[in-house]
Amino acid sequence: MKMRAITAMLLLVLSGQCGILAGKVNKHKPWIETSYHGVITENMDTVMLDPPLVALDKDAPVPYAGEICAFKIHGQEAPFEAEVLNRTSGEGVLRARGPIDCEQQKEYTFIIQAYDCGASPNGADWKKSHKAVVHIQVDDVNEFSPVFREPLYRATVTEGKIYDSILQVEAWDQDCSPQYSQICNYEIVTQDTPFAIDRNGNIRNTERLSFDKQQHYKIMVTAYDCGQKRAMESVPVHIDVKPVCKPGWQGWNKRVDYEPGTGSKQLFPKMHLETCDGPLSSVRAMVELQTSHIGKGCDRETYSEKSLQKLCGAASGSTDLLPAPSTSTNWTASLLTDSGRDSDLIFRFDGRQAANIPDWVVPQNLTDQFTIATWMKHGPSPGLRAEKETLLCNSDKTEMNRHHYSLYVHNCRLVFLLRRDFIQLDSFRPAEFHWRLEQICDKEWHYYVINVEFPSVTLFVDGVTYEPYLVTDDWPIHPSEIDVQLTVGACWQGGEVTTPRFTQYFRGSLSGLTIRPGKIATQKVISCLQACKEGLDISSLESLGKGIKFHFNPAQSVLVMEADDLESINTAMTKVSYINSRQFPTPGLRKLHITTTVQCFGEDTCISIPEIKAMVMVLPPSEPRITIAGVERLVWPSAQLRAPVGVALFKDIHIISTVTKTDATLSIARRPGVLELMHNLDYCDVLVIGEELDPERESLEIHHSSLLGKHLDATNSTSGISIYGVDSMAHYEQAIRQVRYRNWKPGSLSERRFRLSCSELNGRYTSNEFNLEIGVVHSSEAVEHVNHMAVQSQFMRPVHHPLVVHTVNSDHISGTPPAATVVIVMCIAALVVIVVLGIYRIHTTHQDSSKEDEEERKDPEMDWDNSNLNSIEGTQIAEEVREEEPEEDEDEDEEDDDLAGDLSSAESEDSDEDEETNIQKGKVKGKLEWDPSTLPY
């Protein structure tokens, strides 16, 4: 027990002595700088301190007491920690405990102290340094891209202005430092734009913008921060160009397409006038359709002059002095022609061409009433003293140089000279009639008609009447026996010169020059002949209201409208239409001009409205294909050719016209894509192929009654017959079916060939050439044999294909069973009985119908009167008469019923076919002997 007490006492004494010794060893506190400045890069952990973190202790090199064991940080949760790198040297380092984000905190300030290791290994009696202030700045990293504050920018500018700033775009950056958070530059990404942008984001235009050129711009803009980091996404900027309020028409199309056959089409359905809110008292708009380059001034029918006069109801008897060159009209062959694509025949005279009209063409009986008409296009005459330019001249052929009548142009005046042979030679009479008109030298087409009712002469130009401004008198011409010469394009000087020649040449273009003796043209006919088939129109006149006034010029190429308010004129302009009534119009452009005058209150004109230039495009029409079809070969007995009525050549002829359509809706036509079209024809020619007709023994004829009720006429020659006039294909079919060929001396004739062709629009569209061949049978036996083989009870038959007769093999006949032979014989006998009964029935029926015809009616188509025949020598006339055969049947009663049905059907045919059929039946019954009672003449 005593030992334990002694031991404890010793330990206590020793520990006390050690404490006294330690206090004597760790005498000094560590020493550090009073302040530190550090920098740490964002997202890094090491802090760069200035000065470096070093603690000193004067107790060194005493172990523990002179060593540094720790650095401690005091602050509000400073995200840093200090670490001793070397206890002896006192070096330390400052690190971040986690990622440092500059965007959250840019600077940190805290307190740091150094601690030595104390006096012993257990750290007892340690000492700490004074407090030092540490200030740390966070260095930014350019980790964010600029971002625009708006997803889209919009602005509106007025055209024609230069802006310093149209709008400003703005971007920002999330980086914390001024270097990386500021936007230093903007850039327009879109290339070739009339815009620029400065470093502050202001967008301006670099040139004057035009609403007509471009109404909207879309550009893309990007931004750069001061570290040259580019925005991840560019921003769109939309800039609208607002037009300067310009007075004028708006909402119209420069081109309007016109489909042929669509009638009236509105030209400006959405058109309206902008006046910029200016007060107005009246508006006047003039719409002009320019068609001077189309045909003869506008789209007109291009039929021949004869066909047009027939169509317009002009009096017959006019002479065409400028017909198309042909074998019979060869005096125009040497003239220059300018036929357009519409087959519109135009003759050009350049001051060196003229034509002598043959004497047989010249009208010889000009009375006190006659008409001269022509289309003329003429410009100013060259030279200071222009000479006379003669269109038409009738002068002495030889010896003298007297002008009996002439039509000429002199110094843009139209002069008509008429000197008559009078009994009273001592009296002055009106001789020269002068008109001074702008139309004569305006280089445009005009239609001139001179109506002579001597001593009065009236001029019509495009349907408008003009009286002469000057009429001069002259002595009458002394009667003489000197022949006269009618010329076109110049005047013939046959006397008073060494060599007869042309003088006073015409320079211009002529078409349709005609002269009609004995009658003058009426206003209605003149208007019809020169009428335009295209023009301006107003749709829905009733919708215009009372606030609009309008009027057309005679050709409907100019429309003038006036209104007191804007709404009325806008409504009226939407109703303006274009119309072309031709079935096959001339395709191409027609120019449109609109001039507008606006009047304000108390002023003449206050707003200037720009002129509008537009166009109508007439699309090409579907070209028709005219097809003539029928029997191409006929066989006739010579006796029929000798008959007074001859034979009808084209009895079963058919004329159709088709057009090819791409529209799928037209597949209901006869063939997919093909549509049958109804239109007029203007002539059909029947020409003789081979030798011309011999007037001594043959002729082509068409009865005048066949043309009655139609707009048709016919002319003939030894080459053929021409049926002309503007009429339907059905009327042409009817007329052609009445063309008859007659040969009263057919002894040496074995065949004749003819060719039929038709035209629409004076040859613009022509048919196929239909060839017909007729064969002549001279013996009655041959006729009976042919007819028997054809099993027909008529002399003539259409031959569609060569007749092939098959001979029955005798071995086959001998092998026929007896029962079959009996049946065949009985059938043949029954057939013979039926045929005989049928022929008798036909004959009796025809006699009854003939009596009824004589009592009740007389067919004008078959009432042949040789005095009224147009003996058109060289034109084909053939008539094909066909009978239906009764079908054979085992039952004789059924055969009788079938035969009766066929006869009833035959009786229901038209009168022409009935009478022709009856003629043939009578001939069969009489065995080639004519039964006069069956003939209709």
UniProtKB/Swiss-Prot annotation:
Topological category with respect to the lipid bilayer: Single-pass type I membrane protein
SUPFAM superfamilies in the cross-refs = Cadherin-like, Concanavalin A-like lectins/glucanases
Q: Where in the cell is it found?
A: Postsynaptic cell membrane; Endoplasmic reticulum membrane; Golgi apparatus membrane; Cell projection, Dendrite
List the InterPro entries: Cadherin-like_dom, Cadherin-like_sf, CLSTN_C, ConA-like_dom_sf
Q: Which PROSITE patterns match?
A: CADHERIN_2 (PS50268)
Tissue expression per record? By 48 hours post-fertilization (hpf), widely expressed in the brain, with strong expression in the telencephalon and the midbrain.
Q: Biased-composition ranges for Polar residues?
A: 865-874
User: Where is each Cadherin domain found?
Assistant: 32-148, 149-249
Looking at the UniProt entry, the stretches that span the membrane are 819-839
One GO biological process term: homophilic cell adhesion via plasma membrane adhesion molecules
Q: What's the main place this protein lives?
A: membrane
Question: For side Cytoplasmic, which residue ranges?
Answer: 840-937
* Function, in words: Postsynaptic adhesion molecule. Promotes synapse development by acting as a cell adhesion molecule at the postsynaptic membrane, which associates with presynaptic neurexins.
User: Domain note for this entry?
Assistant: Binds synaptic Ca(2+) with its cytoplasmic domain.
Q: Which family does it belong to?
A: Belongs to the calsyntenin family.
Name this polypeptide is given: Calsyntenin-2
The scientific name of the source species is Danio rerio (Zebrafish)
What does the organism's lineage look like at the top? Answer: Eukaryota, Metazoa, Chordata, Craniata, Vertebrata
